[in-house]
């Protein structure tokens, strides 16, 4: 179990055989909370630093003064800063040209990734959880939104189709509320048609939706 979240189940290296290693490659060997998922993605985009997640930043007195403040704590460096930079570029490409197009926000650079997972504790073998995580601005990460839809009733279970638009709406309102200025979307030398051919057209779906 993880020390970060007591109900999270992870494989230790000394208990991971060939089967566990293979299944971990596509995310079917570990159970984690949505909070821990968000923390992991934050580490991917913020230079590789795994931060201790928290829910309350400040506790205020009745007069508005700060009674207690939570200081951000870096648990450890999990990937190199150069790797984090590469991942930000890849996540932005997903939103610009791949299965995350529905997460685009006019005037803001957004990066994201879809995730359509099998739900093993359901009586329906086709049950899925459609998710999408988005970060903005992806060139200077400030906000992350993770949307997970449990067994959505839709023609598709792809997170890029169902959850990405919700991420876009939440992030756009947050960016505007926080006063982050809109900017002209950057030009790219990459051919959109060529890039799109290398990326999933509609997220990660086990049933091909």
Please provide the spans of the model-predicted regions.
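A residue-level structural signature of the nucleotidyltransferase/glycosyltransferase Rossmann-like core
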Residues: 2-3, 48
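Short, small-residue-biased leader/transition segments that mark boundaries at the very start
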Residues: 3-10
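Active-site beta-strand/loop architecture of penicillin-binding DD-peptidases
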Residues: 13-74, 82, 91-179
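Short, highly charged C-terminal tails/helix-capping segments
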Residues: 181-206
């Amino acid at each position: 179990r993880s020390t970060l979240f007591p109900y999270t189940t992870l494989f230790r290296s000394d208990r991971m055989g060939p089967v566990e290693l293979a299944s971990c490659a596509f995310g079917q060997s570990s159970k984690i909370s949505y909070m821990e998922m968000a923390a992991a993605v934050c580490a991917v985009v913020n230079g590789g630093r795994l931060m201790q997640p928290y829910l309350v930043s400040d506790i205020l007195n009745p007069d508005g003064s700060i009674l207690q403040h939570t200081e951000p704590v870096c648990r450890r460096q999990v990937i190199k800063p150069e790797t984090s930079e590469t991942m930000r570029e890849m996540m932005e490409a997903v939103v610009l040209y791949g299965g995350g197009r529905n997460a685009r926000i006019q005037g803001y650079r957004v990066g994201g990734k879809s995730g359509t997972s099998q739900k093993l504790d359901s009586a329906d073998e086709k049950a899925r959880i459609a998710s999408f995580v988005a970060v903005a601005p992806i060139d200077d990460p400030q906000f992350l939104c993770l949307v997970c839809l449990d067994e959505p009733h839709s023609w598709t279970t792809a997170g890029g189709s169902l959850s990405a638009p919700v991420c876009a709406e939440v992030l756009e309102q947050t960016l505007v509320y926080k006063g982050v200025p809109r900017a002209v979307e950057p030009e790219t030398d990459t051919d959109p048609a060529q890039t799109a051919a290398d990326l999933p057209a509609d997220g990660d779906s086990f049933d091909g939706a």
